[in-house]
């Protein structure tokens, strides 16, 4: 360690994960000093850590550095969150810090590099290497520094306001990069306009990594995605872009998390709740309110599931490990709270408040009170009540709602009880909209629930057809409000939101034997504007397949031919195959193999496989080169049931298409297939592949592969040995020749020994 200006060595003390430097004099906060540190990083020597959200914390990762795994491109990438970047460069590794940085990366000329900011120079060296110089001249948090290296192909898209948009992918996905990430520019434009804050950084790049320890990471100007999050072929995106929500989430972080950062992990929700809500905003803009509300409900379900296991404040200072903050409270619950705040103050004030928050905290850190103050400045309201009950308290409302109508007095009375445990959760103050439908009209009322038992009375001239509590479907609460069949049918037909129809669909599912509901479901399956509700209707109707065949079978055929969504069409085809038979349907399944949608092709293939396995085996040969995981699973499943040793090359060929938890499904199907195989060389080769899987850093993949080797290979070949020994013993007693069986036994024993040796090698 030396002082740069004087090049004078200075004393320091290095202990564990920190270095203390004696600067030789006292400096004021206004003075600048320069220090250079020469160091070697050894991340692989660090004690392993991590959490469910980020499974490792050594900061710098060398993936397949020797190239021993032919299915995986060698690469280097980093993961800084929470405080892991100090594993590979000295820094004050704390979210309260802001820093600029530059990095020189020297690599073989064949490699592409990526880091924060801009690539300002590439120097070709005489030894076949090059040195890339990246400069990040805008301040950001240390955990957002990144580096990515590999034989990536850089795909450049149309710039946004002169700022480069680029995607770094493996060669195989170069032609598909714009299909995967192509909405990025539109997202940047949308978020910039919505927030009143133009995208603040120098560029925006996205890179896809193998063996990534999380899902994705919002490194400033250079987001990193795990391959399992977004890799698809262009054709696969016909059935939906699987990474679109994550792409939106990480991009929104560039404002919330990077531009304005949480000052401590206790305030992590400032980063993650907004990124989660960024997904909602994008869905709402791109795909409509139904899509956004459906997406939000899935997030809400995730919170409620974890809330059964624990109850914690959204902002909390008493966590055991900082990674504990990465949970369904910081993300899911936080996103729901942001939505409630939006619905309370209204869109104009909401987005004006976000603009003010970003302006006041740009290139700085913030805590939740800074967010409150921004909203208070814009709205002119004291919002302590809202932030206290949602950010600094546990739990959620549990509401029991009852209504009565007095026709004589023309009075509607609604009684609301807050039944949550008040020793854990607060007594909430809840602004809520109620829509009252009566006499062909809708009357919206806003109420404030403030008491443990609160009664509201409204004058209504006629018996209401429906009282729709929380008409905006924005409240994070468990709600018990009984409704009749007539009310829910009316609600489905008249209330405008996905949540209204989804609530009705839950009732319809429980009362599917009702003839009126059956007729309505037939209509819903065709006409509902949202694909998931149409699919839900099909799933409910499938339980009535036998008694409703004359109506349902032609309806499903119609949906297959006419629905505009490929997933709905695929579900209709799957339901037909599961519930009905007929030559007309067989022709339909074969025709499905010619569709562009892999979802439809896969269902058609599965149908043929279940009805005519020998025909499916013939069809599979022509489909083996299709780059669809849905179809790969279908073909593997068929081979696991009907295949022979001749089908083994297919499993070897497609292995590289799977990563992460997908390898568990691959390994299980592969094991079932190998169980059928009779040739020793096939089984040994398969056991070697499974042994590599069992050496995975992913403990779930590791365990699953070990179990497959033991159950599907060791035990099976032990059974073969036992059977042959029994046959040999019997023939010996009968004084018959056992030469042939002994030869078979020798092969079986040698095969079993090799399997056992491989198994023991991974158990050590």
PLM feature spans:
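Acidic/His-enriched low-complexity segments
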Residues: 1-202, 327-328, 343-345, 361, ...
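Hydrophobic alpha-helical and helix-loop surface patches within well-folded domains
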Residues: 17, 134, 160-161, 166-416
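Short, solvent-exposed loop/turn and secondary-structure capping segments
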Residues: 46-62, 114-117, 144-147, 178-179, ...
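Non-catalytic accessory/interaction domains
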Residues: 79, 107, 112, 130, ...
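Structural detector for internal amphipathic alpha-helices that build alpha-solenoid repeat scaffolds
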Residues: 473-477, 499-513, 523, 532-547, ...
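Amphipathic alpha-helical scaffolding segments comprising HEAT/armadillo-like alpha-solenoid repeats
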Residues: 481-491, 513-526, 546-561, 580-594, ...
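Extended alpha-helical scaffolding segments
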Residues: 667-743, 747
């Amino acid at each position: 360690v030396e002082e740069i200006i004087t090049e004078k060595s200075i004393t320091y003390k290095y202990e564990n994960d920190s270095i203390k430097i004696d600067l030789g004099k006292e400096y004021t906060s206004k003075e600048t000093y320069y220090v250079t540190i020469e160091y070697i990083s050894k991340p692989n020597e660090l004690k392993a850590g991590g959490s469910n959200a980020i499974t490792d914390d050594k900061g710098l990762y060398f993936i397949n550095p020797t190239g021993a795994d032919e299915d995986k491109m060698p690469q280097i990438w980093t993961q800084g969150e929470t405080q892991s970047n100090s594993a590979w460069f000295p820094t004050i590794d704390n979210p309260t810090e802001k820093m600029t940085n530059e990095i020189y990366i020297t690599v073989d000329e064949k490699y592409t590099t990526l880091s924060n900011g801009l690539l300002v120079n590439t120097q070709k060296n005489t030894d076949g290497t090059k040195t890339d110089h990246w400069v990040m001249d805008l301040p950001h948090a240390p955990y957002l520094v990144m580096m990515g290296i590999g034989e990536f192909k850089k795909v450049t898209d149309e710039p946004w306001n002169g700022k480069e948009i680029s995607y770094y992918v493996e060669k195989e996905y170069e032609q598909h990069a714009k299909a995967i990430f192509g909405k990025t520019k539109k997202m940047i434009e949308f978020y910039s306009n919505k927030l009143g804050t133009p995208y603040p950084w120098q560029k925006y790049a996205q890179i896809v990594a193998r063996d990534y320890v999380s899902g994705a990471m919002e490194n400033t100007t250079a987001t990193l995605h795990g391959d399992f999050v977004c890799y698809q072929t262009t054709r696969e995106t016909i059935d939906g872009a699987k990474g679109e929500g994550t792409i939106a989430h990480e991009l929104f972080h560039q404002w919330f998390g990077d531009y304005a950062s949480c000052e401590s992990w206790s305030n992590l929700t400032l980063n993650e709740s907004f990124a989660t809500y960024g997904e909602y905003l994008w869905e709402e803009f791109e795909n409509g309110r139904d899509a956004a509300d459906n997406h939000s409900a899935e997030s809400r379900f995730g919170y409620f599931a974890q809330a059964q296991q624990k109850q914690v404040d959204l902002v909390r200072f008493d966590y055991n490990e900082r990674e504990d903050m990465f949970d369904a409270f910081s993300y899911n619950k936080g996103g729901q709270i942001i939505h409630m705040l939006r619905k309370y103050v209204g869109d104009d004030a909401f987005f004006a408040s976000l603009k003010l928050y970003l302006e006041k905290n740009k290139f700085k850190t913030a805590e939740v009170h800074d967010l409150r103050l921004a909203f208070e400045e814009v709205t002119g309201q004291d919002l302590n009540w809202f932030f206290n009950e949602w950010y600094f308290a546990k739990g959620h409302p549990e509401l029991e709602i009852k209504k009565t109508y007095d026709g004589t007095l023309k009075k509607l009375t609604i009684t609301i009880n807050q039944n949550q445990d008040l020793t854990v959760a607060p007594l909430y103050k809840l602004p809520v909209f109620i829509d009252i439908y009566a006499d062909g009209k809708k009357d919206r009322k806003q109420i404030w629930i403030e008491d443990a038992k609160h009664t509201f009375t409204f004058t209504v001239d006629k018996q209401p057809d429906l009282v729709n509590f929380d008409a905006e479907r924005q409240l994070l609460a468990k709600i018990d409000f009984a409704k009749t069949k007539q009310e829910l049918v009316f609600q489905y037909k008249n209330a405008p939101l996905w949540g209204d129809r989804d609530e009705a669909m839950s009732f319809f599912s429980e009362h599917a034997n009702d003839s009126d509901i059956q007729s309505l479901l037939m209509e819903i399956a065709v006409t509902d504007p949202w694909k998931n509700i149409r699919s839900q209707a099909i799933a409910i109707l499938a339980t009535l397949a036998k008694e409703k065949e004359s109506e349902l079978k032609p309806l499903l055929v119609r949906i297959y031919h006419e629905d505009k969504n490929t997933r709905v069409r695929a579900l209709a085809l799957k339901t037909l195959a599961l519930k009905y038979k007929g030559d007309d349907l067989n022709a339909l399944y074969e025709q499905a193999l010619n569709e562009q949608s892999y979802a439809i092709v896969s269902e058609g293939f599965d149908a043929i496989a279940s009805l005519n396995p020998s025909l499916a085996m013939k069809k599979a040969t022509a489909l083996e080169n299709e780059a669809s995981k849905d179809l790969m699973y279908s073909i593997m499943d068929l081979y696991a049931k009907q295949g022979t040793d001749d089908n083994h090359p297919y499993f070897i060929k497609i292995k590289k298409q799977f990563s992460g938890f997908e390898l568990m499904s691959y390994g299980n199907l592969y094991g079932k297939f190998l169980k059928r195989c009779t040739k020793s060389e096939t089984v040994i080769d398969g056991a070697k592949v499974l042994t590599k899987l069992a050496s995975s850093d992913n403990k779930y993949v590791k365990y699953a592969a070990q179990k497959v080797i033991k159950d599907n290979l060791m035990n099976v070949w032990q059974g073969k040995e036992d059977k042959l020994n029994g046959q040999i013993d019997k023939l010996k007693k009968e004084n018959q020749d056992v030469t042939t069986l002994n030869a078979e036994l020798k092969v079986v024993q040698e095969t079993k020994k090799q399997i056992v040796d491989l198994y023991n090698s991974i158990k050590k």
